[in-house]
Structures are given as structure tokens and as C-alpha cells.
Amino acid sequence: MTTINKEEIQKFSSLADEWWDVKGKFKPLHMFNPIRIEYITQMIKKYFKISDKKINPFNELKILDIGCGGGLISEPMARLGANVTGIDASEKNIKIAQIHSEENNLKINYINSSPERLKEKEEFDIILNLEIIEHVEDVKLYIDSCSKLLKKGGLMFTATLNRTVVSYIKAIVGAEYILRWLPIGTHDWNKFIRPEELEKKLSIANFKTIEIKGLEFNPFNKKWKKSDNLSVNYIICSSKI
């Protein structure tokens, strides 16, 4: 069994060369990245009781970034001192990520793999699942695999899209067809997952929800912000019990 959807991997592999082009096809992700990093960093510090004054605050933490792409989240985590492993089912993405991290003198362990193939059981303090779960083939297997890789008491961040009329209008019609922020076909609305559905799946795999936050785009200042509105983008922070 596998969580890999070959069509999804091929889709993102074809864009691999553009990962670090802030004005290219991944421009929306570069715009989205600051709020993701801010939220994840704040929650990690709060959960693990890490002082804001500490230099390299994550230097005792092992982080697994699943579906790491070109390393847009892996690199900021490494700069904060974390021991980062980034995995992606696309070999081309991994090569791009490796080259970019080496150019920036960052030590990140990049592996062409998927979570069910890793052997590091209960190895990681934190797992990052950011905008990945809506692209996997088998959601249950994916979450179960994450649970096996995370230490008891560890944190997991799962960011995805809600399956609502609003998300269809904004994430599919708006982002792909009207604004052309994303290539047409990037998302399949039927694979979007409602927060209550995801919480249930996480609970079955021994995860307890700490917090759910919406992530909302402001078209006037072109910035993302945290929100209580879960109708489109949202992120669940959960701990393994």
C-alpha cells in the first residue's frame, strides 16, 4: 500500500525548477509562507516552553517536513536550529531542495520517500503536513504512518483546505481559473477535507487536537492572517497521546 498519487507527483515535479522563484508559479505559496512559519513557530515555542530570547530555539528538536517540495518550510526550521528531515515523493523536488540548502549552507536531510516508507519509528518531535493531505492517495494510511514516526507527546501540524462552497469558489474557480495564481488542476475539490472529518481521522490515530486556526487572505494588503474562519484554509495543531 502507498500514499503516493502518481498523477499528483508528476504534476508538482513538472514545476520543480520554479520552487524558489518568488515571482513564478509558486508565488502564492511564497506569499502564504510567512503566516505558516509564524504560527508554527509560536505553537512550537508555547508547547515545548521555549524562550523567545533563546538563540537557535529549536536546536534540540527533530522535525519531519512531509511533502517538503523545494524546502520552503524546511529551510526556515533549520535556520531556527532544528534537525530537519524533508521528504518528498518527487525525486526532482528533492534535488532542487538539496541544491538550494547547500547554496545556503544549511544542513537538511532530504530524502526521496513517503511517510509509510520511512523506518524511523517514534523518531521525530514535530511533523509538518502542510497542504499535502489533499494530494495523497490513502489518507488513513498517511495519518497512521505519521503517528508511527512521531514521538509520544510530539506535535503535528496539518494544514489543508475545507470542502465547502466557499473553498470551491476561492481555491478552485478564483485561484486557478480567474486569478491564475495556480495551474488549472492543482486541486481536486472532492479531496478537500472538512475539519471535523480530519479531527476524527487524527483521533483514531492517537492524536489530540490542541488548536484549529483558519488562515485567511486579505486581498487589500495581499497578506495572510490567522482567523477563526475555517471555510477555506485551516491548520490543525495536534499532539500524539
Label each PLM-derived region with a short phrase.
Residues N190-N206, I212:
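Short alpha-helix
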Residues M1-F26:
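N-terminal, positively charged/glycine-rich alpha-helical extensions of SAM-dependent methyltransferases
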Residues M31-N59:
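Conserved alpha-helix/loop element of class I SAM-dependent methyltransferases that forms part
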Residues S167-Y177:
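Short, flexible, mixed-charge acidic loops at enzyme active sites
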Residues T160, R180-E197:
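Acceptor-substrate binding/catalytic loop of class I
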Residues S51-N56, L61-V166, P195-L198, I236-K240:
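Conserved SAM-binding loop
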Residues K223-I241:
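Core SAM-dependent methyltransferase catalytic element
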Residues I44, F48, S101, L202:
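Conserved hydrophobic residues forming the short capping helix/wall of the S-adenosyl-L-methionine
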